[in-house]
Swiss-Prot record:
The keyword Disulfide bond is annotated on this UniProt entry: no
Name of the molecule in the record: Large ribosomal subunit protein uL11
Function: Forms part of the ribosomal stalk which helps the ribosome interact with GTP-bound translation factors.
Similarity remark: Belongs to the universal ribosomal protein uL11 family.
Keyword list, A-Z: Methylation, Ribonucleoprotein, Ribosomal protein, RNA-binding, rRNA-binding
UniProt superkingdom: Bacteria
Modification comment: One or more lysine residues are methylated.
Assembly with partners or alone: Part of the ribosomal stalk of the 50S ribosomal subunit. Interacts with L10 and the large rRNA to form the base of the stalk. L10 forms an elongated spine to which L12 dimers bind in a sequential fashion forming a multimeric L10(L12)X complex.
GO molecular function: large ribosomal subunit rRNA binding; structural constituent of ribosome
InterPro entries (UniProt xref): Ribosomal_uL11, Ribosomal_uL11_bac-typ, Ribosomal_uL11_C, Ribosomal_uL11_C_sf, Ribosomal_uL11_CS, Ribosomal_uL11_N, Ribosomal_uL11_N_sf
GO CC terms: cytosolic large ribosomal subunit
Length: 141
């Protein structure tokens, strides 16, 4: 018989840097999950993606066991890395902070394709371009 799901927790944690400190500790602690075992497993699984913010979906079962699925980094994080900026524009319609080429947008769209609600690469690229526009990043090409 399948285990009963008690809760699904969604967090964004830096790759390889999960610690029992907030936000991880309190989110898992209130559901009785072994925080250290989650941190250890997450850090092992994301060690190769150092410096990225990784969304994770943790499924907690009634017997306090858990499973988790890591997703691809948010498009905004990937765009900031591609553009070489630390912070997006506070006023994207007035202040443009960087430019990225269509080739970079395509790379990001291909990487994000599995987590996106898009039927083809063109649709995924349009989503990434929209994210770039809302961040004050100009897409060239």
């Amino acid at each position: 018989m399948a285990k009963k799901v008690a809760q699904v927790i969604k967090l964004q944690i830096p790759a390889g840097k999960a610690t029992p400190a907030p936000p991880v500790g309190p989110a898992l602690g209130q559901h009785g999950v072994n925080i250290m075992s989650f941190c250890k497993e997450f850090n092992e699984q994301t060690a190769n993606q150092e410096g990225m913010l990784i969304p994770v979906e943790i499924t907690v079962y009634e017997d306090r066991s858990f499973t988790f699925i890591t997703k691809t980094p948010p498009a905004a994080v990937l765009l900031k890395k591609a553009a070489g900026i630390d912070k997006a524009s506070g006023e994207p319609n007035k202040n443009k902070v960087a430019t990225v080429g269509k080739d970079k947008v395509k790379e990001i769209a291909e990487l994000k394709m599995q987590d996106m609600n898009a039927s083809d690469l063109d649709a995924a690229m349009k989503m990434v371009e929209g994210t770039a526009r809302s961040m004050g990043i100009i897409v060239e090409g």
